[in-house]
Amino acid sequence: MSAFLYLASDHPLPERPNPHLRTLSVREALDLGMEVPDFLLEPEVDQDAPDTILWSDLELHIDPDAPLPTGLGPDDDFAVWPMEEKLLDMQTEKPYCACVEWGQYSPGRGRLLLEYLREQMQHTRELEFWHIWLDGALDHPLRQAVIPLTELTVEDISELAQVDFSQEPPTDYCFRIIR
């Protein structure tokens, strides 16, 4: 069970990769001088297979006494990934969906997501921004708001991104953004 942010549209949503993450083959990692776990150096492992190692240029500091990593990191540390298939829990009827992925919300990430949404609204009359609870239940109550793009703010994105799912029953939230 977890919270999940996604966008839905009648127009394909382009990928917005996280500029701090890169996937590498074992050989690429070795060429960069990275330490690679021994099991990846075994003869049966294809050294040229893509997407074997996830590399980040950010250093994560983990405090074992803190519930979440401390520090928000750079504003551009987020991604939008088009989804090939909808998850069962998704209530949208729109054909194109994309996952919004960030460790935690920050105003800078909200601002960059707002820019992305504005760009996408050039191709469609309506876009949905969802925050749902993934638990396999298909009967969550839905709270929905319609917001004209000209009125959508970083504060609106913050409100949706930071929804508290600790209340029972879990509620799914959707902003329908219109032109």
Q: What does each of the following model-derived ranges do?
A:
Residues M1-R179:
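Structured alpha/beta or helical-core interaction and ligand-binding surfaces enriched in interleaved
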